[in-house]
Amino acid sequence: MKYVVQEWLRITTLLFIAQAVSAMVLPNATLLEELLEKYMDEDGEWWIANVSRKRAITDSDMQSILDLHNKLRGQVYPPASNMEYMTWDTELERSAESWAETCLWEHGPASLLPSIGQNLGAHWGRYRPPTFHVQAWYDEVRDFTYPHPHECNPYCPYKCSGPVCTHYTQVVWATSSRIGCAINLCHNMNIWGQIWPKAVYLVCNYSPKGNWWGHAPYKPGRPCSACPPSFGGGCRENLCYREGSERPYSPHEPEEETNEIERQRSKAQDATAQSRPRTHSPSGSTGSEDSEKNEVISTQQMSQIVSCEVRLRDQCKGTTCNRYECPAGCLDSKAKVIGSVHYEMQSSICKAAIHYGILDNEGGWVDVTRQGRKNYFIKSYRNGIQSIGKYQSANSFTVSKVTVQAITCETTVEQLCPFQKPASHCPRVYCPHNCMQANPHYARVIGTRIYSDISSICRAAVHAGVVRNEGGYVDVMPVDKRKVYIASFLNGIFSESLQNPPGKQGIQSICCRLNQVDYKTGK
């Protein structure tokens, strides 16, 4: 099951994962603020954890997660007679850390799932404490109806009026008395086909596992009236409590109280990472040794980097004038914006994007579409920018948001964004690794530099030198049909030739390599 809750004002997508259920948080914001500051050193560089460190969560975050779980477990309704006090388990923490490091939006590992419960949460954008996810899991209680004893004959019905309630039931499962969580910063996570540049990933593992089919999460009754004998009659805040169970883990030195983000890397590796896509190396043979013999690396960009003052009239030349990268701080620029919705060609590209609401003052990517002549342009004040009115005919343009979409090795432009006159804006796509090994019958490459729209986008990108076999970001631009597509062998891939394809157009795959994309805003 997959659960999405949209908060209209913040345009936020929520997703949380209990066993066999997924969940996350996507606020429309530009910075990770306080949380990311924890993971940066004094020079502003990402902090690199020491290999010997085992902790993947700070003591303060650990304690807040644990305290909130116990608080919520003690206040269930109807009251629980056998709800056990929850303690921290370092082994569960380590297993959560191991899974968090995979940055996969699914439950795992498969070998542990039969014996543990698991809730997952993630967000990117503005700072959210880990307890935000815990509270959201619990808030599913509004859709859950507790099964009364007379309904359990012998199995209890599962009554959930919302999309999912299993996150809540795992949090309050009476016998799930141990918890261990980890937090990891994941770069370029694939979330339901969307790429999140910097996702903060929370994994919480529970033991013994909950959510057993046909069972209620706890026994109703007077608090602590049905505690297991091993608790010796102890009760704390409506929870069955065993003396000496409050801190079963060893405290760590303050300097080690920080989340592990990446493994130790040498300066040489860091320098290499700045010039290559940050993706995991595929296992096994990739064919890269052979491709080096005919390696062609494209450094041409479809998108253009512009300043706050650049006007579309100055910059828009040729077929590539559709995507621009704007810097931060354009609200302070004196550049003019003429019009509303439709902007005159002498308008600042970046300030028009802010005026329309595509970007904020942090900058980012914007798509531009030329719209031909308009008889007049209306002034308005939006998002901190006053635009100017003009009552003379002039050429115009509109702005739109640049989206990012993950695709497969077989995805084609014909499927993704077919050509439409005068032009089509395709999303920025993220190609997976190992597309060189994809079946060439299902992932064809037709052409050289300009490819037929029935070609595999990702294999064409490898062929063109836009990305390597490790995958990465690619921009594609549908263009009008071509009569001839030329075959060639480049970067380990043979492309096909084709002449006079009926009704087909070409795709111009021009570079946007991963290290050339600045995802400051995720826009």
From Swiss-Prot:
SMART domains: LCCL, SCP. Residues 1-23 form the signal peptide. It comes from the Eukaryota. Residues 66-206 form the SCP domain. GO terms for cellular component: extracellular space. Residues 302-397, 403-505 form the LCCL domain. Belongs to the CRISP family. This is Cysteine-rich secretory protein LCCL domain-containing 1. It comes from Gallus gallus. The gene is CRISPLD1.
